[in-house]
Design a protein with these regions (language model features):
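Non-catalytic alpha-helical scaffolds and adjoining flexible linkers that form interface surfaces
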Residues: 1-170
Length: 170
Protein backbone atom coordinates (compact mmCIF):
# COMPACT_ATOMS: atom_id res chain seq x y z
CA UNK A 1 0.00 0.00 0.00
CA UNK A 2 2.81 2.43 0.72
CA UNK A 3 4.23 2.10 -2.79
CA UNK A 4 0.98 3.19 -4.42
CA UNK A 5 0.87 6.82 -5.48
CA UNK A 6 -1.92 9.20 -4.65
CA UNK A 7 -3.64 11.87 -6.65
CA UNK A 8 -5.02 15.10 -5.38
CA UNK A 9 -7.60 16.45 -7.82
CA UNK A 10 -9.20 19.86 -7.75
CA UNK A 11 -12.14 20.79 -9.95
CA UNK A 12 -11.22 23.94 -11.84
CA UNK A 13 -14.27 24.29 -14.05
CA UNK A 14 -17.52 22.37 -13.92
CA UNK A 15 -19.44 22.06 -17.16
CA UNK A 16 -22.21 19.94 -15.68
CA UNK A 17 -24.48 22.86 -14.82
CA UNK A 18 -24.20 24.23 -18.38
CA UNK A 19 -25.06 20.87 -19.91
CA UNK A 20 -27.88 19.97 -17.55
CA UNK A 21 -29.81 23.27 -17.60
CA UNK A 22 -31.89 22.24 -20.60
CA UNK A 23 -32.98 18.90 -21.94
CA UNK A 24 -31.45 19.59 -25.34
CA UNK A 25 -28.03 20.08 -23.73
CA UNK A 26 -28.19 16.68 -22.07
CA UNK A 27 -29.43 14.99 -25.24
CA UNK A 28 -26.64 16.49 -27.34
CA UNK A 29 -24.04 15.58 -24.73
CA UNK A 30 -25.40 12.02 -24.68
CA UNK A 31 -25.09 11.84 -28.48
CA UNK A 32 -21.51 13.11 -28.29
CA UNK A 33 -20.63 10.48 -25.67
CA UNK A 34 -22.24 7.65 -27.64
CA UNK A 35 -20.58 8.61 -30.93
CA UNK A 36 -17.18 9.04 -29.25
CA UNK A 37 -17.35 5.74 -27.39
CA UNK A 38 -18.55 3.97 -30.53
CA UNK A 39 -16.20 5.31 -33.19
CA UNK A 40 -13.06 6.74 -31.59
CA UNK A 41 -10.14 4.35 -31.13
CA UNK A 42 -8.58 4.15 -27.70
CA UNK A 43 -5.25 5.78 -26.86
CA UNK A 44 -5.32 8.20 -29.78
CA UNK A 45 -5.25 11.97 -29.29
CA UNK A 46 -8.01 13.97 -30.93
CA UNK A 47 -7.14 17.52 -29.86
CA UNK A 48 -9.25 19.25 -32.52
CA UNK A 49 -12.26 17.10 -31.67
CA UNK A 50 -11.75 17.80 -27.97
CA UNK A 51 -11.76 21.56 -28.57
CA UNK A 52 -14.81 21.28 -30.82
CA UNK A 53 -16.55 19.27 -28.08
CA UNK A 54 -15.84 21.98 -25.52
CA UNK A 55 -17.12 24.60 -27.96
CA UNK A 56 -20.26 22.53 -28.51
CA UNK A 57 -21.18 22.03 -24.86
CA UNK A 58 -19.98 25.28 -23.27
CA UNK A 59 -21.87 28.52 -22.95
CA UNK A 60 -25.48 29.55 -22.90
CA UNK A 61 -26.87 29.53 -26.40
CA UNK A 62 -30.23 29.29 -28.12
CA UNK A 63 -31.45 25.87 -29.17
CA UNK A 64 -30.71 26.68 -32.82
CA UNK A 65 -27.16 27.69 -31.91
CA UNK A 66 -26.64 24.49 -29.90
CA UNK A 67 -27.86 22.42 -32.84
CA UNK A 68 -25.60 24.35 -35.24
CA UNK A 69 -22.62 23.71 -32.99
CA UNK A 70 -23.54 20.02 -32.81
CA UNK A 71 -23.61 19.74 -36.63
CA UNK A 72 -20.15 21.34 -36.70
CA UNK A 73 -19.05 18.85 -34.04
CA UNK A 74 -20.21 15.91 -36.21
CA UNK A 75 -18.22 17.35 -39.13
CA UNK A 76 -15.15 17.53 -36.87
CA UNK A 77 -15.75 13.90 -35.82
CA UNK A 78 -15.71 12.88 -39.49
CA UNK A 79 -12.56 14.95 -40.09
CA UNK A 80 -10.80 13.50 -37.04
CA UNK A 81 -11.46 9.98 -38.30
CA UNK A 82 -10.16 10.76 -41.80
CA UNK A 83 -13.48 11.34 -43.56
CA UNK A 84 -13.49 15.14 -43.65
CA UNK A 85 -15.59 17.07 -46.12
CA UNK A 86 -14.14 19.78 -48.36
CA UNK A 87 -16.66 22.61 -48.12
CA UNK A 88 -14.35 25.49 -49.08
CA UNK A 89 -14.37 25.31 -52.89
CA UNK A 90 -16.30 23.73 -55.75
CA UNK A 91 -14.97 20.32 -56.70
CA UNK A 92 -15.96 20.88 -60.36
CA UNK A 93 -14.90 24.46 -61.10
CA UNK A 94 -12.60 25.29 -58.19
CA UNK A 95 -14.57 28.46 -57.45
CA UNK A 96 -15.00 29.49 -53.83
CA UNK A 97 -18.28 31.36 -54.24
CA UNK A 98 -21.92 30.36 -54.52
CA UNK A 99 -21.47 26.92 -52.94
CA UNK A 100 -24.90 25.34 -52.53
CA UNK A 101 -24.47 21.56 -52.58
CA UNK A 102 -22.22 18.69 -51.49
CA UNK A 103 -21.40 15.69 -53.64
CA UNK A 104 -22.36 12.46 -51.84
CA UNK A 105 -19.54 10.60 -53.62
CA UNK A 106 -16.61 12.94 -52.98
CA UNK A 107 -17.78 14.89 -49.92
CA UNK A 108 -16.83 18.12 -51.69
CA UNK A 109 -18.83 21.28 -52.18
CA UNK A 110 -20.44 22.06 -55.54
CA UNK A 111 -21.43 25.53 -56.76
CA UNK A 112 -24.91 26.29 -58.05
CA UNK A 113 -23.57 26.77 -61.62
CA UNK A 114 -21.78 23.42 -61.61
CA UNK A 115 -24.75 21.60 -60.11
CA UNK A 116 -27.25 22.40 -62.86
CA UNK A 117 -29.14 19.20 -63.69
CA UNK A 118 -27.71 17.33 -60.71
CA UNK A 119 -29.51 19.09 -57.84
CA UNK A 120 -31.65 16.08 -56.92
CA UNK A 121 -28.60 13.83 -56.53
CA UNK A 122 -26.62 16.27 -54.38
CA UNK A 123 -26.91 17.10 -50.69
CA UNK A 124 -27.80 20.68 -49.75
CA UNK A 125 -24.97 22.66 -48.13
CA UNK A 126 -26.41 24.69 -45.23
CA UNK A 127 -25.63 28.40 -45.16
CA UNK A 128 -23.83 28.11 -41.83
CA UNK A 129 -21.22 25.71 -43.26
CA UNK A 130 -18.55 26.11 -45.89
CA UNK A 131 -17.30 29.48 -47.04
CA UNK A 132 -20.78 30.98 -46.65
CA UNK A 133 -20.53 30.66 -42.88
CA UNK A 134 -23.14 32.78 -41.24
CA UNK A 135 -23.46 33.46 -37.55
CA UNK A 136 -27.25 33.43 -37.66
CA UNK A 137 -29.16 30.37 -38.68
CA UNK A 138 -31.84 31.50 -41.08
CA UNK A 139 -34.23 28.59 -40.79
CA UNK A 140 -35.02 25.21 -39.33
CA UNK A 141 -34.63 23.84 -42.87
CA UNK A 142 -30.99 24.96 -42.81
CA UNK A 143 -30.41 22.95 -39.62
CA UNK A 144 -32.24 19.97 -41.10
CA UNK A 145 -29.97 20.12 -44.14
CA UNK A 146 -26.97 20.16 -41.81
CA UNK A 147 -28.21 17.05 -40.02
CA UNK A 148 -28.98 15.30 -43.32
CA UNK A 149 -25.46 16.09 -44.52
CA UNK A 150 -23.69 14.73 -41.44
CA UNK A 151 -26.06 11.76 -41.14
CA UNK A 152 -25.33 10.74 -44.73
CA UNK A 153 -21.55 10.78 -44.27
CA UNK A 154 -21.64 9.16 -40.82
CA UNK A 155 -23.75 6.32 -42.23
CA UNK A 156 -21.56 6.03 -45.32
CA UNK A 157 -18.14 6.20 -43.66
CA UNK A 158 -18.47 5.17 -40.03
CA UNK A 159 -21.05 2.37 -40.12
CA UNK A 160 -18.47 -0.24 -41.22
CA UNK A 161 -16.05 0.84 -38.47
CA UNK A 162 -17.64 -1.24 -35.74
CA UNK A 163 -19.87 -3.44 -37.89
CA UNK A 164 -23.20 -2.79 -36.19
CA UNK A 165 -26.45 -1.16 -37.18
CA UNK A 166 -26.26 2.60 -36.93
CA UNK A 167 -29.97 3.11 -37.69
CA UNK A 168 -30.97 3.52 -34.06
CA UNK A 169 -28.86 6.73 -33.84
CA UNK A 170 -30.94 8.45 -36.48
Amino acid sequence: EESLGTFKVELIKSRYHTISEERIGLELFNLICVLCSTFLPERVDFDDLYHETIKCIEGKHSIKEKLRRYVEWELQLLTSLGFGLDLDKCVVSGSKGDLKFVSPKSGCAVSSKSSVGWEKKLLVLPEFLGNRKSVNISSIADLENGFKLTEYFIRKNLNPVKGFQIDHFF
